[in-house]
């Protein structure tokens, strides 16, 4: 099984943009950003904390919110770098 790298919020946001997620409407000031992707049957909402290093457990939760597996996420990360 692929081991998740330690990433910053900027790296995660690059992957989200690469996969077609868009910033959600502003919800005020805060330490997190929200991204949305609408598909035919679902609307996915992904919350990303602003951090220099996102813990692996938090990153795994973000990947699940995106609807991806770890392998799919790592592949997308390599594609957008």
Tell me what each language-model feature is:
Residues 53-81:
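C-terminal structural segments of small proteins and small subunits
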Residues 3, 44, 73:
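Glycine-rich, flexible loop/turn motifs
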Residues 4-10, 49-51, 57, 80:
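Surface-exposed loop/turn and secondary-structure junction residues enriched for glycine/proline
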Residues 23-61:
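A short, structured beta-strand/loop element
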Residues 1-27, 40:
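N-terminal first-folded block
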